[in-house]
Amino acid sequence: MKVNTKSKKVNKAWLNSHVNDPYVKAAQKDGYRARAAYKLKEIDEQLKLIRPGATVVDLGSTPGAWSQYVRRCLSPEGAAVGALNGRIISLDLLPMEPIEGVQFILGDFREEPVLAQLQEALGGGKADVVVSDMAPNLSGNGTTDAARIALLVELAVDFSIHHMKPEGALVVKLFHGGAYDDLVALFRQTFKVVKPIKPKSSRDKSSETFLVGMGLK
């Protein structure tokens, strides 16, 4: 049997990089489920989006690192458990291990039964902040992947228009490439203030970036 030594070397290099990543180590130390928590943390510390008493909706929440960060923001003690000053509703197509104080809804938020659960969780109100770390399964085809990424961002924007307060904020993940300029234009059409941010915790070689839209037009 022929062994692909190049592939094995690449996998080993990635594993070494992952194990030695300071954000991976920090996540383990701080009790976060993924290093992604620090991306939202950087964005939030820069823009002060998540405040005590806020209602936050986390789209594409699994495994839950962003919800964990939000939970700590809304805790009077900054704790992972205990009292909570605010509301967190997380949605994903995949199951998520429970987080104390976080209401999780399993399903596609485009479907009526799931939307009904969300509206019930919101108690007739709207979100102060919507965060979306949604990402598609990538095919390797640039055109196809750009379209999939664009669709998820567009869905998050549409969700915010209908379920977020006028003065609220939306954070989405996207990637530089095919549809990037069009998505920035969509944000500028939708929000009063638009800020592209590349957190330090995003990997250097990644084309990943984040867009923040504040205040619906």
Swiss-Prot record:
Q: What's one GO MF term for it?
A: rRNA (uridine-2'-O-)-methyltransferase activity
UniProt subcellular location: Cytoplasm
Q: What is its EC number?
A: 2.1.1.166
Kindly indicate whether the keyword Methyltransferase belongs to this entry.
yes
What is the predominant subcellular site recorded for this chain? cytoplasm
**Could you tell me what reaction this enzyme catalyses?**
uridine(2552) in 23S rRNA + S-adenosyl-L-methionine = 2'-O-methyluridine(2552) in 23S rRNA + S-adenosyl-L-homocysteine + H(+)
Per its UniProt entry, what is the enzyme's top EC class, as one word? transferase
Keyword list, A-Z: Cytoplasm, Methyltransferase, rRNA processing, S-adenosyl-L-methionine, Transferase
Q: Which family is this protein grouped under? A: Belongs to the class I-like SAM-binding methyltransferase superfamily. RNA methyltransferase RlmE family.
Known function: Specifically methylates the uridine in position 2552 of 23S rRNA at the 2'-O position of the ribose in the fully assembled 50S ribosomal subunit.
Protein name, per record: Ribosomal RNA large subunit methyltransferase E
Report the source organism. Answer: Delftia acidovorans (strain DSM 14801 / SPH-1)
What is this protein's gene name?
A: rlmE
